[in-house]
Amino acid sequence: MQQIIADITKDQLRTDHPDFRPGDTLKVHVKVVEGNRERIQVFEGVVIKRQNGGISETFTVRKISYGVGVERTLPLHSPRIDKIEVSRRGIVRRAKLYYLRNLRGKAARIKERR
């Protein structure tokens, strides 16, 4: 039974995404349905966590929009994600960057990896 589930989920995994880690700045192109039409919305922000593994892997991206912090958690292998672009690579020493929620302005910056 476990082998059948593994075979089914292996077909659903997406391999077209780039490697990214917490601290990286991403542009996530998400398909959004509005009424009867579908468009692509770009959500750009810092990855604050990656969670789980396999087909159920998710990641959370945080950005500041009009002075308000916005976080979006997305399934990595979702068909709703059109593409993911890494715009900056960041240096961090943590796997979960929850402390960024309490920082404002220049204090919330992350150093860039060379």
UniProtKB/Swiss-Prot annotation:
Entry GO MF terms: structural constituent of ribosome
Assigned keywords, A-Z: Ribonucleoprotein, Ribosomal protein
Record GO cellular component, one term: cytosolic large ribosomal subunit
Xref: SUPFAM superfamilies: Translation proteins SH3-like domain
GO biological processes: translation
SS bonds (residue pairs): none
InterPro entries per record: Ribosomal_bL19, Ribosomal_bL19_CS, Ribosomal_bL19_sf, Translation_prot_SH3-like_sf
Gene3D superfamilies: 2.30.30.790
Cross-referenced Pfam families: Ribosomal_L19 (PF01245)
Free-text function comment from the UniProt entry: This protein is located at the 30S-50S ribosomal subunit interface and may play a role in the structure and function of the aminoacyl-tRNA binding site.
Family the UniProt entry places it in: Belongs to the bacterial ribosomal protein bL19 family.
Protein name: Large ribosomal subunit protein bL19
The gene coding this protein: rplS
